[in-house]
């Protein structure tokens, strides 16, 4: 069975073939860390988490990178309003992000590069674009000359000649930078320093990077000049991903990514989510009312490229669905010996793969899981009330192991203690201290991506790190 993906770049479905057989490089545009994550972030992170899990299930070794944008006007504005620093705001919401993702069952990325940790690479890339004639300095800023890149618009399908400045949401007629630009569609690669804002030294003077160049530099630094899969929300297609392509491909002369995948946007009770409509919901607010895995199930039940509607009715239906899966998943813990062999049903796995291989049709894969879960629920009731089953117990064991395996692929895992089987208390204190030491060494070596990865790994296991003055790190286990 061949994995088929819808490629935004080609606007058609294509068979997936990685650059290197058996290995997949994957980059996700992450969050700008100025506030708590909302429903849109939940969908994006869950979808690409499951895509990564599924690729690994198929046997690929996946290197998955997700960035943090920690230099941005929104972060600066919040820092000014709270009389604190940009770094303090970023750290607070990065920590909050890890907490939210751990609750949703999103596995940590292999690295979390940040703009502030990639400044040398950003400046090198801007310099290279300037040397090749794709960028020009102007009064302390550096701009990308969009019309120099003949393929501009190939991802979004937008052509510059068809756009009017001020009408696209991309260029504002009262843009204060307009006087500095050679063309109204040019965008900033480097912004000159402003009073009261953080800035860094560069060949063009003190300043900070523009948003789009950050991701181009981080992709190159973490994964190379060309990657297999670049993902993100559909709202990033234009201008962000379009500009990433323009920057990276002008610099290298090579494709930035072979496959561009985008998840659809979020609606709340049929309306676009926005603060002005009063329906803006954070992940924390949502998880105060609903089981995180019910939220995950709702997300996976929708076609990932289409809009999804979060409503109380939909979330209640997803909650009921998660209860059904839980009842099926609990069968083995309640009714099977702990040493029964982990044999799975290949025919059921084939049906699961056949569904999901068609452009990540997770809903089709879930249908297979529900079929198994409902049978196991029925047979579990038979065992509880009649002491016997309609099917052979060995066959039911095979189906249960299949359900556990495929549920894990979708991140719909139930702890053994929920099935009335004792489990250990998790990662040991010694292992925690060992990882903290590794994180300390990474920070000393200025390997901040590894430091973030270790913190995320511990957070996923219910461990919160608290950095204190003097380089001391304390930890708390969830529930302590």
From Swiss-Prot:
Compartments, as annotated in UniProt: Cytoplasm
Keywords: Aminoacyl-tRNA synthetase, ATP-binding, Cytoplasm, Ligase, Metal-binding, Nucleotide-binding, Protein biosynthesis, Zinc
Free-text remark on how the cofactor is bound: Binds 1 zinc ion per subunit.
Intervals of motif 'HIGH' region: 31-41
EC id: 6.1.1.16
Pfam families: DALR_2, tRNA-synt_1e
Annotated SUPFAM superfamilies: Anticodon-binding domain of a subclass of class I aminoacyl-tRNA synthetases, Nucleotidylyl transferase
Positions with a binding annotation for Zn(2+): 29, 215, 240, 244
Residues at which ATP binds: 275
Chief location of this protein within or outside the cell: cytoplasm
Residue window of motif 'KMSKS' region: 272-276
InterPro entries, per database record: Cys-tRNA-ligase, Cys-tRNA-synt_Ia_DALR, Cys-tRNA/MSH_ligase, Rossmann-like_a/b/a_fold, tRNA-synt_1_cat_dom, tRNAsynth_Ia_anticodon-bd
GO molecular function: ATP binding; cysteine-tRNA ligase activity; zinc ion binding
Cysteine disulfide links: none
Annotated GO biological process: cysteinyl-tRNA aminoacylation
Catalytic activity: tRNA(Cys) + L-cysteine + ATP = L-cysteinyl-tRNA(Cys) + AMP + diphosphate
GO annotation, cellular component aspect: cytosol
Cofactor(s) of this protein: Zn(2+)
NCBIfam families found in the cross-reference section: cysS (TIGR00435)
Assembly and interaction partners: Monomer.
Similarity comment: family membership: Belongs to the class-I aminoacyl-tRNA synthetase family.
Protein name, as recorded: Cysteine--tRNA ligase
Source organism of the structure: Microcystis aeruginosa (strain NIES-843 / IAM M-2473)
């Amino acid at each position: 069975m061949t994995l088929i993906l819808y490629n935004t770049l080609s606007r058609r479905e294509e068979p997936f073939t990685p650059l290197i057989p058996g290995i997949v490089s994957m980059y996700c545009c992450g969050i700008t860390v100025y506030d708590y994550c909302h429903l849109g972030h939940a969908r994006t992170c869950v979808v690409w988490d499951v895509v990564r899990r599924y690729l690994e299930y198929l046997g690929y070794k996946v290197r998955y990178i997700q960035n943090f944008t920690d230099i941005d006007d929104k972060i600066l504005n919040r820092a000014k309003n709270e009389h604190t620093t940009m770094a303090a705001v970023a750290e607070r919401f990065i920590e909050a992000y890890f907490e939210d993702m751990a609750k949703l069952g999103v596995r940590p990325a292999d690295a979390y590069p940040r703009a502030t940790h990639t400044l040398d690479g950003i400046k090198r890339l801007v310099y290279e674009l300037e040397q090749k004639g794709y960028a020009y300095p102007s009064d302390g800023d550096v701009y990308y000359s969009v019309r120099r890149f003949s393929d501009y618009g190939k991802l979004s399908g937008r052509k510059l000649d068809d756009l009017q400045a001020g009408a696209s949401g991309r260029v504002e007629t009262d843009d204060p930078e307009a006087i500095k630009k050679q063309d109204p569609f040019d965008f900033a690669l480097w912004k000159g320093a402003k009073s009261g804002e953080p800035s860094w030294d560069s060949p063009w003077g003190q300043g900070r990077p523009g948003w789009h160049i950050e991701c181009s530099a981080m992709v190159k630094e973490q994964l190379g000049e060309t990657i297999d899969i670049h993902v993100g929300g559909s709202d990033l297609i234009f201008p962000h991903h379009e500009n990433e392509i323009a920057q990276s491909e002008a610099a290298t002369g090579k494709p930035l990514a072979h496959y561009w995948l985008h998840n659809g946007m979020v609606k709340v009770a049929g309306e676009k989510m926005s603060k002005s409509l009063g329906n803006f919901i954070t992940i924390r607010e949502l998880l105060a009312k609903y089981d995180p895995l019910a939220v995950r199930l709702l997300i996976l039940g929708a076609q990932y490229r289409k809009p999804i509607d979060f409503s109380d009715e939909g979330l209640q239906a997803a909650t009921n669905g998660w209860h059904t899966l839980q009842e099926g998943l609990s069968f083995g813990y309640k009714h099977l010996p702990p040493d029964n062999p982990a044999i799975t049903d290949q025919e059921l796995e084939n049906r699961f793969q056949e569904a999901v291989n068609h452009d990540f049709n997770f809903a089709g894969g879930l249908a297979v899981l529900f079929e198994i879960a409902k049978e196991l629920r029925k047979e579990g009731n038979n065992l509880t009330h009649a002491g016997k089953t309609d099917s052979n117990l060995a066959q039911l064991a095979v189906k249960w192991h299949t359900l556990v395996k495929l549920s894990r692929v979708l991140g719909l895992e139930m702890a053994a203690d929920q099935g009335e089987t004792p489990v250990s208390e998790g990662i040991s204190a010694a292992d925690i201290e060992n990882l903290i030491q590794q994180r300390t060494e990474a920070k000393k070596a200025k390997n901040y991506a590894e430091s973030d990865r270790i913190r995320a790994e511990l957070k996923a296991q219910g461990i919160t790190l608290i950095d204190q003055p003097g380089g001391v790190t304390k930890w708390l286990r969830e529930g302590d």
